[in-house]
């Protein structure tokens, strides 16, 4: 089996290409999930202030027999805190029982409030202080990103967006790449695979490689150059989602999956959400 792959970000920092997302998990569920994930080989964990489970993540990491330097921890600045990123980050650090965050993401742009540039400036300062290694955003459209770059001169290293076979966001993915912004996929399995896992191309590839539909879709993300964070609290699924290093999809197979794109957004519209 090949080793899990890593991605080098434009700021020089390195992150695992595959991590565990913990959205919708309770503090108790998160502790068990992370323990299992660490056993399997995960080293990247993605939480957020809005998930209300940073304390559980912190407890799990405190109990882990893995060095802090081997871990890659992501959390996020919530919409209500755009005008107080320092206080929000310090609160997250306290709950996570950490001295620094590997990746701090602004969760949504919330253009209706229009504080995202100021929030970004605050995040830049926190990075300079060493409280954050890398800074990025979630759910930013091209015009939001361009404004950040124009007004601060600092480009996010990550744009974490809804991305799955039904919503491939190719234009945004390409724009990110042109600007050396790594695209990261949330809801990578289209919320449990509905409308994806039963597609003939996915089933055929699962049969060909002796894998599950979920593993095929995760491999599609990896082979498309995306960072991917499937979420689960089920031990067997956590292990299954990480067992993707012994095969690759070829260019034609990636092209077949590309045909599934419907522009079907399952989550909120970033231009409308919040406020």
Swiss-Prot record:
GO terms for biological process: L-ascorbic acid biosynthetic process. GO terms for cellular component: cytoplasm. Transmembrane segments: none annotated. It catalyses: hydroxyacetone + NADP(+) = methylglyoxal + NADPH + H(+). GO terms for molecular function: 2,5-didehydrogluconate reductase activity; aldo-keto reductase (NADPH) activity. The keyword 4Fe-4S does not apply. The active site is at residue 51. Substrate binds at residue 107. The keyword Electron transport does not apply. It is an enzyme of class 1 (oxidoreductase). This is Methylglyoxal reductase DkgA. It comes from Escherichia coli O157:H7.
